[in-house]
């Protein structure tokens, strides 16, 4: 990937790396991809993000039915970020399922009036937050948020598929030398695809 040159990050009006859900005309099942920079795809081209690879695999499985996955990953986002986005968009998109690649459990959001701060690596509160927390507490918080997203999905009869960032392996790096590269994204997509295929049993 490092030899392929600069990556262009094309975003819609809401700063998501996908088409605008409000103007999309896909006449088929729609899905939402949630997570942090590993979902957004920092360091890889749009075609190499796991959500794009997953969409292609799903489309090949059901070629007669158009499929759309909206990549709503937010760099530096937390599980709280994913929940907020899901809560605000699920009624609009009405997804068949939601794919969640969990962000690190220690991250948080601070919402004050119309301002949202993402407490992640590099934030002034990051080290303090880490010092007063523990891996057990972070895991519990992440579990609470995933359950909240599951409840949100259940209200709209959508399935929730979860891939935990702590249980995945990064086999390569992207252009930035830090985030997962194309091969890693293929593995993420493969995992989500197996969940989707097992649940919906699609036929060609």
Q: Language model features by range: what are they?
A:
Residues 10-75, 80, 88:
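Serine-esterase "nucleophile elbow" of acetyl-processing enzymes
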Residues 50, 85, 145-149:
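A general structural detector for well-ordered alpha-helical segments in enzyme core domains, enriched
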